[in-house]
């Protein structure tokens, strides 16, 4: 089935004939030509845009832009410069203009052609199978309360009901959003686009998602170099972020910020069952599972269930022969990080009690400060924090160190 070309239905006016038209006749001519072109574009999106359509979309007549620099169509430019003459249009031109709508492809012809094209197109969707041109480029008449940039009709997309000020913008929107024919395909995700520029923008997202910063120790990759630098501290043992109150150090600044809240004593998350409060919402969620008895995380080897994912992860290490924490001095490996920490202290030759009295703090100083300051925290600080002092003191008593 042969399609009607734009040249078959276009009406040409000379400059003299165009000057004889009044404002209403020029508007009628513009609307008919643009509507005809949009009908043909709907059938063949790859059709080249004629020079006449370029001129009409910019508010000029059917001549060159240089000749039309001082004239414009109504509703787009100032119409005060138009001639006041009201000569009649030649009858042959009027008859040709009236016949244009008869030569424009009918809705039945468009539907048949569209159905034939969509059968061979990939990704055909049901909502595009019966979409006549009037539905695609439906022009809603303006009301008194409606405003527009071009003081003309509004063009509404039938598929998504978006409204546009001119027909060319509607056509671009349809090609980009609803058109079935999309020749540009992404090699990585097979997503298709009508415009090549859209494909280029989409491909940049794939390049940004590639993790190009890789750790030389464990091979883990990251999006940003700052994330890699923070990760490398876990291998070197460097903890640059230290709490000024308890001297506890952290790898990440976010961990230090979260830790400081524990000193403030703020616990905004309260359990409704037992009224116990927590500083983090995640801890409250773990606690609430104790009341419900919910244990959704089950070990596949021993069928033991846990209430939190981290508990299951720690439990799985006991089943495996993997010892991820290795001592750099003697290459001995351990299941748990706390075991490695306790082992490394043996290489330094420092006992638990010596750790506590590193700053020449004795048990008498500890008890004396408690009596002077009462229940408050002592004013001096330790190298390993108060909790380490209590733990070391108890171990020294059990081992006969005092």
UniProtKB/Swiss-Prot annotation:
Molecular-function GO term, any one: zinc ion binding
UniProt zinc finger (C2H2-type) residues: 155-178, 184-206, 213-235, 241-263, 269-291, 297-319, 325-347
Any one GO CC term of the record: nucleoplasm
Cell location: Nucleus
Keywords of the record: Metal-binding, Nucleus, Repeat, Repressor, Transcription, Transcription regulation, Zinc, Zinc-finger
Top-rank taxon: Eukaryota
Gene Ontology BP annotations: innate immune response; negative regulation of single stranded viral RNA replication via double stranded DNA intermediate; regulation of DNA-templated transcription
One Pfam family in the UniProt entry: zf-C2H2
InterPro entries per UniProt: KRAB, KRAB_dom_sf, Znf_C2H2_sf, Znf_C2H2_type
Residues in KRAB domain copies: 4-75
Comp. bias (Basic residues): 125-139
UniProt region (Disordered), positions on chain: 118-139
Classification via PANTHER family: ZINC FINGER PROTEIN, ZINC FINGER PROTEIN ZFP2
Role according to the record: Transcription factor specifically required to repress retrotransposons in embryonic stem cells. Recognizes and binds retroviral DNA sequences from a large subset of mammalian retroviruses and retroelements and repress their expression by recruiting a repressive complex containing TRIM28/KAP1.
UniProt record similarity statement: Belongs to the krueppel C2H2-type zinc-finger protein family.
Name by which UniProt lists this protein: Zinc finger protein 809
Native source organism of the sequence: Mus musculus
The gene coding this protein: Zfp809
């Amino acid at each position: 089935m042969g399609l009607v070309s734009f040249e078959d239905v276009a009406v040409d006016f000379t400059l003299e004939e165009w000057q004889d038209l009044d404002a209403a006749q020029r508007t009628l001519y513009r609307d008919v030509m643009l509507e005809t072109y949009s009908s043909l574009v709907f059938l063949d999106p790859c059709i080249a845009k004629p020079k006449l359509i370029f001129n009409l979309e910019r508010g000029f007549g059917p001549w060159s832009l240089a000749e039309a620099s001082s004239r414009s169509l109504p509703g787009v430019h100032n119409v005060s410069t138009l001639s006041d003459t009201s000569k009649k249009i030649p009858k042959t031109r009027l008859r040709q203009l009236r016949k244009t709508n008869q030569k424009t492809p009918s809705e039945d012809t468009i539907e048949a052609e569209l159905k034939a094209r969509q059968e061979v197109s990939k990704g055909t969707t049901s909502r595009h199978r019966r979409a006549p041109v009037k539905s695609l480029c439906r022009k809603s008449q303006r009301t008194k309360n409606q405003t527009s940039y071009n003081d003309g009709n509004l063009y509404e997309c039938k598929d998504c009901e978006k409204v546009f000020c001119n027909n060319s913008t509607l056509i671009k929107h349809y090609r980009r959003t609803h058109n079935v024919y999309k020749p540009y395909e992404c090699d990585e995700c097979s997503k298709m686009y009508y415009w090549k520029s859209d494909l280029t923008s989409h491909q940049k997202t794939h390049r940004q998602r590639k993790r190009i910063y890789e750790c030389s120790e464990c091979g883990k990759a990251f999006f940003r170099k700052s994330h890699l630098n923070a990760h490398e501290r876990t291998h070197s043992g460097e903890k640059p972020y230290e709490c000024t109150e308890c001297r506890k150090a952290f790898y990440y600044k976010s961990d230090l910020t979260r830790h400081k809240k524990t000193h403030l004593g703020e616990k905004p998350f309260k359990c409704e069952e037992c009224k116990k409060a927590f500083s983090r919402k995640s801890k409250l969620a773990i606690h609430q599972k104790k009341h419900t008895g919910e244990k959704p995380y089950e070990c596949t080897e021993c069928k033991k269930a846990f209430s939190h994912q981290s508990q299951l992860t720690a439990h799985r290490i006991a089943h495996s022969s993997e010892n991820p924490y290795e001592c750099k001095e003697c290459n001995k490996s351990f299941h748990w990080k706390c075991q490695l920490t306790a082992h490394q202290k043996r290489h330094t030759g420092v006992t638990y009690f010596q750790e506590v009295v590193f700053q020449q703090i004795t048990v008498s100083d500890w008890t004396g400060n408690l009596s002077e300051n009462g229940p408050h925290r002592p004013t001096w600080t330790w190298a390993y924090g108060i909790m380490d002092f209590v733990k070391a003191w108890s171990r020294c008593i059990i081992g006969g160190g005092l």
